[in-house]
Amino acid sequence: GNEGSGKTLFTKKLKTLFENQSDPKLCTIFEQFNVKKSLTEIKSWFSKNGSKISEKKEVGIIELSNIENIDDFLLNLSKQESDIKISIVNLMPVGNSYEYLMKNMPQKRFENEYLALTKLDLCDLSIVEIAAFVELNHKCMFFSGVRSSEEGLYFAKVGETADHIVQTMESRIG
């Protein structure tokens, strides 16, 4: 996510979510991303925790500030650790116009790439935003909207999203 999208708070919320689920996971957050430094840290972490990671008992969360770095990062990481499984969660605060999203948000490029909508405590998700995400082929995985790192991260569910759309339309019609 871009600056101001809520990356740092989201990573803390994601860590809390992983650590408090029915099958808890230990989490390590890699902040202040720097390709060379972070790859060294991740390789060291992976070497120390390889068995826990492969047993899905430990998870690493890497905070990237610029999506342009992701291709180089993924290439370098896969060269160093071919067994590592990666999912990408792009963050986008709500409250953007359709035109802004179409111009500034890249198309989904990877099978394991998802979307988290942030700042839902500050602004409502609009129908035009949903349309842009659909056109850009993004799958929404999380909604985030409370400033506390202990709460406010929810899995995006079709029924709840559909209810939100219906409520929004009814409030505008009625």
Description of each model-found segment:
Residues 68-75, 99-102, 125-128:
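Conserved ATPase-coupling elements of RecA-like P-loop NTPase cores
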Residues 7:
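Conserved lysine of the Walker
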Residues 84-92, 109-127, 134-150:
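Conserved beta-strand/loop subsegment of P-loop NTPase cores
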Residues 20-21, 50-56, 79-85, 107-110, ...:
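Conserved catalytic network of the ASCE P-loop NTPase/AAA+ motor domain
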Residues 10, 14:
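Hydrophobic positions on the alpha1 helix immediately C-terminal to the Walker A/P-loop
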Residues 2-3, 26-74, 81, 90-94:
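Switch II (G3) loop of P-loop NTPases
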Residues 133-174:
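NTP-binding/hydrolysis catalytic cores, primarily Walker-type P-loop NTPases
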Residues 16-28:
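Post-Walker A helix-loop "phosphate-sensing" segment adjacent to the P-loop in P-loop NTPases
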